[in-house]
Amino acid sequence: MDIYDSVRNIIANIERVPSTTQEGIAPIGRAAQWSRYTGITVESVVDTVVEACEQEAKRLGIPVVIAIVDASGSLVYQRRMERALGVSIELAPNKAYTAVAFRCGTEKLGAVVQPGTPLYGIETMVKRPIVLFGGGEPLMLENHLIGGLGISGGTVKEDVLIVN
């Protein structure tokens, strides 16, 4: 299965997500249920993730905005480093949301939505802003999506270095 097949499957599942599963658990409820058993939530990893991103941004000498969303795409944390670009305040959370919505990095998604591909124009078909260049990654823990991370402020290459 190539990346195109993976993203097509993700899109198909997004369109068909039921309000509840056969077990009667809402999909987001399943993530919450997993969190109750493990004690691991996106909020519990925020400090670690932010510290790692800030250290890398400082090492590169790039002021950035760091945004973290939960598994539903809701913003749980945002920090703007001194001198970070103003537009990054919007881009970072949108990158994090995109990573959660498609369950893949924004750089990978951008590669499969180019003209001539089956997903071309997907960003115009949804209400929330979708970012199609690097800087957003899903936060996975034990094969569970717990949230998304968005970095904005440097070049795309620099944002990708920091987010990874």
Could you describe each region identified by the protein language model?
Residues D2-N164:
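Flexible, solvent-exposed loop/hinge segments and secondary-structure transition points
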